[in-house]
């Protein structure tokens, strides 16, 4: 229960941090922040030939703050990720396909996940690792292109004990 309340508090702080940035954005993209642990970073394998089957309306925010067509691994531009060799497929692929089909709008994904972290490490100013601050910074970059529609968190097993 404590972990859930903590997560709600962290996400509330994230949402509040974006209010001022929304007034100055474009409306070209629906922005989605995908953060969390290894499950969000992507550790799954895809069937050969289906690795990069994205809708033409799905994009990523790259490490230079620019919009590029989405390709896997989605966590490739994360400012906090572990090595590229372990970045694979996460829930962002299926999510982006569904949301793009449902809305018909351009989707901009900000994927900034890191495996092996705990909820406490994502708290604002708590860990010194800067995961919260990086999520806020990258989302503000993306909001020059569109409006933040949702923050999607996927827990790994960092707090399972």
Language model features with spans:
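Compositionally biased, low-complexity segments enriched in small residues
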Residues: 4, 16, 116-119
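Bacterial N-terminal signal peptides that target proteins for export
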Residues: 1-7
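Sec/Tat signal peptide C-region and signal peptidase I cleavage site
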Residues: 19-22
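Cell-envelope and extracellular/periplasmic
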Residues: 24-161
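Bacterial N-terminal signal peptides
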Residues: 8-17
């Amino acid at each position: 229960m404590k972990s859930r309340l903590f997560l709600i508090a962290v996400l509330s702080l994230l949402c509040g941090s974006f209010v001022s940035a929304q007034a100055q954005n474009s409306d070209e993209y629906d922005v989605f922040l995908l953060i969390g642990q290894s499950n969000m970073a992507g550790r799954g394998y895809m069937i050969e030939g289906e690795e990069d089957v994205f809708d033409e309306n799905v994009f990523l925010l790259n490490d230079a703050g620019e919009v590029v067509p989405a390709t896997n691994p989605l966590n490739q531009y994360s400012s906090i990720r572990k090595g590229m060799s372990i970045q694979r497929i996460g829930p962002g692929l299926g999510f982006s396909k569904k949301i793009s089909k449902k809305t018909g709008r351009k989707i901009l994904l900000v994927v900034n996940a890191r495996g092996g972290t705990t909820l406490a490490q994502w708290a604002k100013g708590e860990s010194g690792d800067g995961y919260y601050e990086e999520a806020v910074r990258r989302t503000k970059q993306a909001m020059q292109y569109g409006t933040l529609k949702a923050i999607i968190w996927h827990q790994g097993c960092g707090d399972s004990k």
